[in-house]
Amino acid sequence: MLTGAGISADSGVPTFRGADGLWRNYRAEDLATPEAFERDPRLVWEWYNWRREILATKQPNPAHDTIVKLEQQWGDRMWLITQNVDGLHRAAGSQRLSEIHGNIWTVRCTGCGVISGNREIPLPILPTCRLCHALLRPHIVWFGESLWEEDLRRCDQAIHSCDLLLVVGTSGVVYPAAGFASMAKEAGALVIEINLESTPQSDLVDLSLQGRAKDLVPLLL
C-alpha cells in the first residue's frame, strides 16, 4: 500500500504547500532544503516547531485505522509505504511501513548522525545532540536530497513482489513514489487508486475510485 497527503487531509492535516502552506510569506520549498538549513537553521527550526504544534493536535482517521487492521490480517504479506511525515500511521499502530520522506517527530544529529524520536513542543531553537553537542535537524528528506538507500531497497522489493498495490491519497507527481504504480503493473500486480480526483496515473491503474480516503478505505475490510 502507498499513501500520500490525501489520507492525512481527512485528519485535518494541511499540505504545507501552495498558498495554504505559506508561513511568514515563506513557501515549504524555501525552507525544506539543506541550503536553507545551512543558511538559517533557526528559521527552519521555527517553521518545524510551528508544524509540530499543528500536527500534535491531529489524530489518525478511519483510513489509518483500517490499514492497521489490514496489516493485522495480512501479516508479512503487507507492506505500507507512506510519503507523509506526520507520523499518523505509526500513531494508529502501523508497524510494517517505510516512511520514505521521514518523520517530523524524529531528529538526526548533523555531527554523529544519531537518529532519535523527539516529541518535545516546542523544541529549543537550535537543538543540539546530547552525545556530541552538534546541531540537530529534522529527520526528513528535504528538497534536493535523495531517499535513504534502505527505504528504496525495501520499497523496490515490495513493489516488485506484490500481487495488489493500493494507492491512497497521492498526487501521482512526486517521484520516486509516482512511479510505483507503473512498476507494480509491469511486475503483474493489480493496482487500485483511491483519491479525491483523478491523477496522472489514473489511466494506467486497474481501478480508480474517487472519494475521501476515510470513507473508501474502510470498505476494503
Give residue spans per PLM region.
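Conserved catalytic core of sirtuin-type NAD+-dependent deacylases
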Residues: 1-221
